[in-house]
Amino acid sequence: MTLDAFTAFCKSLAHSTYVCQWGGSHVWKIGGKVYVIAGDSGGVMDRVSFKVTPIAFDFLKSQPGCQGAPHLASRGMKWIQRTTDEAMSDAELLTYIRDSYRLVAAGLTKKLQKELGLAATELPPKAARR
């Protein structure tokens, strides 16, 4: 996936904000909370980390081209890092990024969700967020 395609997708998610931090990582947030972190090499994404459900974490961490996200999964958080495209297509990656956005948005305070205009029907059920 190109950096331009990744950026366009993240920009399309309501209230997403961008910051370049941690040594040049492309970090996208909702309500001030990170939902995806990516690195690129020459405009091509070479690693992408995103939040997942516990079931997706257990499945993806054993797939070629995926691992628990460094500095996040080691703290018990359910974050996966895709290091190559052999584990999933770009379309599947975008689905996981959208799911990560929804999981992080669901964890925001009710007040902030309301301020951002996030409808409860757009967010995953509480049980799926753990």
Feature-to-residue mapping (PLM):
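Charge-dense, helix-prone N-terminal extensions
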Residues: 1-130
